[in-house]
Amino acid sequence: MECSSFEAICNESEMIAHLQSLFWSSSDADPCFGSSSFSLISSEGYDTMTTEFVNSSTNVCFDYQDDSFVSAEETTIGNKRKVQMDTENELMTNRSKEVRTKMSVSKACKHSVSAESSQSYYAKNRRQRINERLRILQELIPNGTKVDISTMLEEAIQYVKFLHLQIKLLSSDEMWMYAPLAFDSGNNRLYQNSLSQE
């Protein structure tokens, strides 16, 4: 009989502890709370055993309640941290994109600067070669140093045409005797052009 009442008391104290854990906050819990049948038992060993059981179960209950409150707070804090971490991640992502963009722009600028410098180097060399050729051409053309570049180029074109005509006349069997006349007329025309420019 004592066994069955002991089991009933244990079951009842477990239920009480469970109900305390569900409904009461830690300040409202009373570890000595029990049923009337629990208070009627007066055996010291049994009483200390059940009191320890009730105390341990309520402590478990309080721990459970504290854990539930902490987890709710942690959830709130976790959500705040999650939002904060999300915004920080977005900021870091944006910053890394900006850094990548700046790096690619700077690389492109360096590449374009080097390309521009190489292009300017080639353009400078090209201009130097053109100027050298123009000086040589000025020396070959009669009165080429006395006129501007555009006039000198026109005279050079006329002079080249004259030279082609001379080649044709000298290479043909019938017209070779007229070559000196063509030379004189071509030469006179160049001379007249240079006089008109001065």
UniProtKB/Swiss-Prot annotation:
This is Transcription factor BHLH133. The gene is BHLH133. Transcription factor that acts as a regulator of iron homeostasis. May act as negative regulator of iron transportation from root to shoot. Does not seem to be involved in the suppression of the induction of iron deficiency responsive genes. Disulfide bonds: none annotated. Keywords: DNA-binding, Nucleus, Stress response, Transcription, Transcription regulation. It is found in: Nucleus. InterPro entries: bHLH_dom (IPR011598), HLH_DNA-bd_sf (IPR036638), IND-like (IPR045843). Belongs to the bHLH protein family. Plants overexpressing BHLH133 are hypersensitive to iron deficiency. The lineage of its organism: Eukaryota, Viridiplantae, Streptophyta, Embryophyta, Tracheophyta. GO terms for biological process: regulation of DNA-templated transcription; regulation of transcription by RNA polymerase II. Residues 114-127 are annotated as: Basic motif. It comes from Oryza sativa subsp. japonica (Rice). The keyword Transcription regulation applies. Residues 114-163 form the bHLH domain. It comes from the Eukaryota. Disruption phenotype: Slight reduction of shoot length and 2-fold reduction of seed set. Induction: Strongly induced by iron deficiency in roots. Slightly induced in shoots. One of its GO terms (molecular function) is protein dimerization activity.
